[in-house]
Regions:
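C-terminal membrane-solvent junction of multi-pass transporters and transport-like membrane proteins
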Residues: 381-465, 479-483
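Transmembrane alpha-helical segments of multi-pass small-molecule transport proteins
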Residues: 82, 122-123, 150-177, 191-202, ...
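Transmembrane helix-loop boundary segments of multi-pass membrane transporters
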Residues: 67-78, 147-161, 180-189, 291-308, ...
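Membrane-interface "cap" regions at the ends of multi-pass membrane proteins
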Residues: 2-73, 224-231, 249-257, 473-487
Length: 487
């Protein structure tokens, strides 16, 4: 296939770099296409890739938060299951990775255009990812500092910085080594982390009040407000992972889409539901306003350092994926750096934000606020992506997606696919109007006493808009057009 002529933007920097994807070696490939000769693995390996990050301390925190908000135990568990169903969407967009053989931040040029995609990826693939890096590193650092206090080390800003930098350094190292190392390492981490968190769960179950009811049961509209807010908090996790194509792109092109979807979704769904549920059970008797202290109160002393190390290891696993994809996102928006250097830059930014967060913000408040508000952006963007996959029947030409010239089939009008951009903006605007949180209540939400409909409005609205606007702008994806490749 002939490539289009170069423009000042030109093809991506690394578009013809040789690949190397072996565990224990630094991955040399960036966003460039993975040729069929270098494809390997099975969809089953995606289970541990997504399980390790979700055997998580934050799951306990979120589960406890639902009960603290005033939900009953049964309602909390129902919200946990419902919100985590969005992992199916994360799994679904992963099918585009093997189809195109490149990262999701490049594939999304089909939705937003060569130029428009830069702005979208800068926001969702870089800025929001950096915020999540800081959030997770903050959680692990709080746990790590608790361990240093038990060891008798005096608390100080210098010690805070050392703990953060050690955790961040381990995370960035995983991201630098890249895909094959992540796949191999996360299989072992899934087993180890599951053993530790299952042991903790058994301890929590021994203190659970199975007949728990809130002291002041919620009724009427106030009840719906808390239910929708809790649902938003839980669903924000799967809706933030638009990077799933990055981890599936090395799979053979013929890998079944259903297998990719289910192994990805199940890997994240199962531990998320189980351990978020355990967090809710813990809150029936423990004071989860201070989740670390609450959980440590049911542990034998010897288990506390094991728990803290597991929290740190899980954070490394979680943020390892985020940092890995953030490096690819930087390349896709035109930052001409090797993948390894791009990951280092992301790590420095995330570390700086973490230190600021530890010194300035209350951790639990920051978790709730971010998880309630981030879906305003991530929900519509992920839905536009999923809708494009449906409309194109998952047929993407990775080589054409790397062409950034004005003759690129993804140049659209002035480099922007206005159907995708307006659909994402429209969905985000609708979600903003209907969002309700501690820090922000949109006019629609405020008129309904804080009812949070950001997710259904943002998700359904952006999907409908993208389909309608694609026809209106004449960019409706055609499976027989030269912009696609038959599989």
């Amino acid at each position: 296939m002939q490539r289009s002529p170069r423009s000042p933007a030109g093809p991506d920097v690394a578009a013809s770099a040789p690949g190397r994807d072996r565990a224990g070696l630094v991955e040399s490939r960036g966003i460039d296409c993975v040729p069929d000769s270098e494809r390997h693995g099975t969809a089953r390996e995606l289970f541990s890739v997504w399980a390790a990050p979700n055997v998580s301390y934050l799951s306990f925190v979120v589960g406890g938060t639902l009960v603290l908000m005033g939900l009953s135990l049964a309602e909390s568990l129902a919200v946990i299951v419902a919100g985590n169903l969005f992992w199916l969407l994360t799994g679904f967009i992963a099918v585009s990775g093997p189809a195109a053989g490149t990262s999701g931040s490049v594939i999304s040029r089909a939705m937003y255009g060569v130029v428009g995609n830069k702005a979208v990826v800068a926001l969702t693939g870089w800025l929001i990812s950096s915020l999540y890096l800081a959030l997770n590193w903050s959680a692990a650092s709080v746990a790590g500092l608790g361990l240093t206090a038990r060891l008798g080390l005096p608390d100080s800003p210098a010690l805070d910085a050392v703990v953060v930098c050690v955790i961040a350094g381990a995370t960035i190292l995983v991201a630098i080594y890249g895909h094959a190392t992540i796949v191999r390492l996360y299989t072992a981490l899934t087993i180890v982390l599951t053993l530790v968190f299952v042991a903790l769960s058994v301890m929590v179950l021994g203190h659970t009040n199975w007949s728990y009811t809130p002291a002041e049961p919620l009724t009427g509209l106030a009840h719906l407000v808390v239910l929708t807010s809790g649902f938003t908090i839980v669903a924000s996790a799967p809706l933030s992972y638009s990077n799933s194509p990055d981890l599936s792109r090395y799979l053979p092109r013929h890998t079944r889409g259903r297998a990719i979807t289910l192994w990805t979704a199940c890997g994240a769904f199962l531990p998320s539901v189980v351990f978020t549920g355990i967090g809710a059970l813990a809150a029936t008797t423990l004071d989860m306003n201070d989740p670390q202290a609450a959980l440590e109160s049911v542990m034998p002393h010897w288990f506390v350092p094991v728990f803290v190390v597991a929290v740190v290891v899980n954070t490394v696993a979680n943020n390892g994926l985020t940092a890995y994809s953030s490096g690819l996102s930087m390349q896709s928006i035109g930052v001409r750096l090797p993948r390894m250097i791009a990951v280092l830059v992301v790590g420095v930014i995330g570390t700086t934000m973490t230190l600021f967060a530890l010194l300035v913000f209350d951790f639990l408040t920051a978790v709730n606020a971010m998880m309630e508000l981030v879906v305003i952006v991530t929900g519509p963007c992920m839905t536009v992506y999923a809708t494009d996959i449906v409309l194109r029947r998952n047929r993407y030409d990775g080589e054409l997606l790397h062409d950034q010239s004005r003759t690129s089939p993804f140049w659209y009008r002035g480099g922007v696919n206005w159907a995708g951009v307006l659909a994402a903006l429209g969905g985000a605007a609708g979600a903003t109007l209907c969002a309700g949180s501690t820090f922000w209540a949109g006019p629609v939400s405020a008129a309904m006493d804080g009812l949070n409909l950001a997710i259904p409005v943002g998700v359904l609205g952006s999907a409908a808009l993208y389909r309608v606007l694609s026809r209106a702008f004449g960019t409706f994806p055609s499976t027989s057009s030269p912009t696609t490749t038959q599989r």
